[in-house]
A protein has these predicted regions:
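Nucleotide-sugar-dependent glycosyltransferase catalytic domains
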Residues: 1-153, 158-182, 195
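A donor-sugar binding/catalytic signature common to diverse glycosyltransferases
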Residues: 26-29, 211-260
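Short, hinge-like loop/turn segments at secondary-structure boundaries
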Residues: 65-68, 201-205, 246, 263
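Catalytic donor nucleotide-activated moiety binding site of glycosyltransferases and closely related
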Residues: 171-209
Length: 263
């Protein structure tokens, strides 16, 4: 999300689109789409950040060495992009890390209680809108209807980025089975070699359902436990459906989700 070539191309494309259809009333963006934040300033449109709180700037002294190195590299890249497009960076934090920070509005799909330990770092442009369970729009899949309605299910997923850890899936499924739960293991669309796929199947309990994807509205109402990586979307879904979570974080904001779930 900080590739100067790709970000620059994105800014140009969004600017051209605004020229064609007119300046939008606002640009609503993912918290990591640098091009959208730059383009919003360039065309003079307010930026709304979707799915991320507005927080105070990080203190460089609190960063690890490798974080400081990456932060300096990020600042240098952003300064070159500002100069290229004649911008000042109104939609970015000016501290140690140049994260996207709208002065107008950040929408969080959690609530203030979820961020109670971080309350002192939240900025007033954060609006908590919470969330509600979605109702299924279609019939449940056949594999799910074949599981008895009173059978306890453990949903096991590592999202889309970290889905290649075969040992993790096997260990979680074995633990769930020993606890009397039926493991539903969701591995995403990660490409496994035939050997790795066979090894995974051999390591799973015989009661396991192994899938690429599941519909949360169908499976979560029947789930007794979800074991996952702490991704924001998975964590949020488990919360709104009231499913107990066992979180094993890997990277990014996952440590924070695990900490908040424990609190």
């Amino acid at each position: 999300w900080m590739s100067e070539d790709l970000v620059g191309a994105g800014v140009e494309a969004l600017t051209e689109l605004a020229d064609q259809i007119g300046k939008p009333d606002a640009i609503i963006t993912d918290p990591f789409l640098t091009a959208a934040a730059l383009a919003a300033e360039r065309i003079g449109a307010p930026l709304v950040v979707s799915g991320w709180c507005a927080t105070r700037e990080l203190d460089e002294d609190a960063l690890y060495y490798v974080q400081k190195v990456l932060a300096r590299e990020s600042i240098e890249r952003m300064e070159r992009l500002y100069e290229r497009f004649g911008l000042t960076g109104v939609n970015f934090a000016s501290g140690a890390t140049p994260s996207i920070l709208s002065p107008h509005l950040h929408l969080s799909y959690f609530n203030a209680e979820w961020y109670q330990a971080d309350a002192d770092n939240l900025l007033p442009q954060t609006l908590f809108v919470g969330g509600t369970p979605d109702q299924p729009a279609d019939a449940p899949p056949a594999w799910l209807t074949q599981i008895p309605p009173d059978a306890p299910i453990a949903l096991i997923t590592f999202g889309t980025t970290f889905a290649g850890d075969i040992g993790w899936f096997a260990g979680a499924a074995q633990a769930a089975a020993r606890a009397g739960l039926i493991p539903v293991v969701v591995i995403g669309w990660t490409t496994y070699s035939p050997e790795d796929k066979d090894a995974l199947k051999a390591a799973l309990p015989k009661t396991t359902r192994l899938l690429n994807w599941v519909s949360f509205p169908h499976i979560l109402p029947r789930t007794r436990l979800i074991i996952h990586h702490g991704g924001m979307g998975t964590t949020h879904a488990a919360l709104v459906y009231g499913v107990p979570q066992l979180i094993i974080p890997y990277a990014a904001d996952q440590q924070g989700q695990a900490r908040r779930a424990a609190q």
